[in-house]
Amino acid sequence: MNMNTAPKQYGFYMPAEWYPHERCWMAWPCHHETWSKIGLDKAKMAYARVAKAIAQFEPVTLLVNPGDEDSAENLCKGHNIEIISLPINDSWTRDTGATFLINNERQLAGVDWIHNAWGGNYADCSLDNLIASHLIKYTEAQYFHAPLVMEGGSFHVDGEGTILTSKECLLNSNRNPHLSQQEIEQYLINYLGAERIIWLNMGLIGDETDGHVDEIATFIAPGKVLCLITKDKEDPNYHRLQENFEILKSSKDARGRTFEVYTVEQPPATYLNGERLTLSYINFYMANQGIVMPAFGYESFDRLAYQLFVQIFPGYQITQIDALDVFSGGGGIHCITQQQPKSHKLVE
């Protein structure tokens, strides 16, 4: 059944990423322009590393362009990974897949946002704009269409009423120029089932998504956030990351808690074909009892980030994998994944 009204009215909300998952959704690399820096073959191997790491903890369902199934099966077969043929433009299910919701009866719903290729970065996103509806139909979830240009990487939730996002992305004129900040807030609250929004200002320099929050800060537990920083005052990210840190330190969540703020340092500036990559340890995937986080080849930075994750995620197995090739495409581990929470079937 389709509903033209917002999910919150029916008791649906987006749970936190630490809520138990049914599966993780990914899509197989296929867009030559996206992967021009390293080539599609290396991109596929990088995605396979991520998929197999996540599949240690939960099932992975991989969307693959028709005709490209062999490469996916060769690299991923037999690792708790299901392959589904579906025409796609690109491979960022965080942004193009459905945003899954649950209610107190643990019934499943999905939000289908409007996708415009991150403000028109790519000419054709017509197939990717259909992915969310395919996922919602496949999972037999309740369907909600949101009349808002939005990507899943542009917000985080704590599942207890709080949304974390950035002004650089959501208030960008290439997304929803006809809407005010207050109107966008109301859409987010109604479609994510929340009460309060915390606005950070700027994302990372050179982020082609216009400052997605999943590169700079995230919830790690109720009342706790992890924030990206740099100690290098000459780095152009220094002031914007420091400002975000100060905002989080002075903010309260929907339940009135002042945040306990943890920080992780960004790795050194890294360039590929003259362009700085937006590397961030914040861009990880939280699976069932496991964390899949990136390594970038900087031993001391990678080690310190790993040790921090061991500390802040007690009870989770931390898996750190080489993710530089994933980030060469403009995003990270969180960007190429989308969790589906555990749920019960809707009662007809």
Swiss-Prot record:
GO molecular function, a single term: protein-arginine deiminase activity
Catalysed reaction, written as an equation: agmatine + H2O = N-carbamoylputrescine + NH4(+)
InterPro entries according to UniProt: Agmatine_deiminase (IPR017754), Peptidyl-Arg-deiminase_porph (IPR007466)
Residue positions of the active site: C335
EC number: 3.5.3.12
GO biological process terms held by the UniProt record: putrescine biosynthetic process
Keywords noted in UniProt: Hydrolase
HAMAP family the record matches: Agmatine_deimin (MF_01841)
Family indicated by similarity: Belongs to the agmatine deiminase family.
Protein name: Putative agmatine deiminase
Annotated organism of origin: Legionella pneumophila subsp. pneumophila (strain Philadelphia 1 / ATCC 33152 / DSM 7513)
Gene: aguA
